């Protein structure tokens, strides 16, 4: 009996919800030693992860924000760079020959626009030794306010959960994050707590306003 696709095909990693300020610092890339080892002992087929400052890892990310700039940075092949800004800062996504649908989508998108981006972290190190992190998009979609608010709340909860585990020495990659990153955890946590509270308060105010009785028309 042949194996089903779910048994024979590797499962996609879940996309991690992460804010721009943490994502931009996630410059360390690694592979798990015991993930799909090759015959020669090297894990060349193993998925690649980026180490998050909060002590987690991300093979794929789900991010949202407002597209503020779209620029064509290469003609052959056509490559577009979009700057996307969330409540913590801006991040970049690059779409090129391996992302033809996303290239077309960005070509027809007019900034500013609120979007969701699902994709893989990608890092580039300059000759000067500076490393920049961006998203290689699998999907870009325009989203409504309700979706943005829901993502913001979920991202805040997931980020705070990772930070709690980090502070309790229970994060899966907490030691590595402490070793490699010089990150202001106190300010970052305060920012995320404030962002989460703002979303809750805003939604509560909108609910209260919607519940107010309407005055009868004359």
Predicted segments with their positions:
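GNAT/GCN5-related N-acetyltransferase fold signature
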Residues: 84, 119-121
């Amino acid at each position: 009996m042949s194996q089903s696709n779910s048994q024979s095909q590797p499962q996609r990693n879940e996309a991690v919800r992460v804010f721009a300020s943490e994502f931009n610092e996630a410059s360390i890339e690694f592979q798990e030693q015991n993930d799909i080892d090759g015959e020669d002992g090297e894990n060349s087929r193993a998925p690649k992860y980026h180490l998050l400052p909060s002590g987690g890892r991300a093979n794929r990310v789900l991010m949202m924000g407002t597209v503020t700039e779209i620029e064509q940075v290469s003609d052959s092949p056509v490559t577009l760079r979009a700057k996307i800004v969330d409540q913590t800062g801006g991040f970049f996504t690059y779409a090129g020959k391996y992302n033809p649908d996303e290239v077309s989508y960005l070509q027809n998108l007019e900034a500013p626009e609120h979007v969701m981006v699902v994709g893989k972290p990608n890092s580039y190190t300059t000759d000067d030794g500076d490393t920049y992190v961006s998203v290689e998009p699998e999907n870009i979609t325009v989203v409504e306010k309700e979706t943005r608010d829901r993502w913001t709340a979920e991202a805040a909860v997931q980020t705070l959960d990772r930070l709690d585990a980090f502070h309790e020495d229970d994060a899966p990659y907490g030691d590595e994050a402490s070793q490699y990153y010089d990150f202001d955890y106190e300010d970052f946590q305060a920012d995320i707590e404030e962002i989460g509270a703002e979303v809750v308060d805003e939604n509560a105010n909108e609910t209260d306003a919607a519940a107010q009785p309407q005055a009868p028309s004359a």
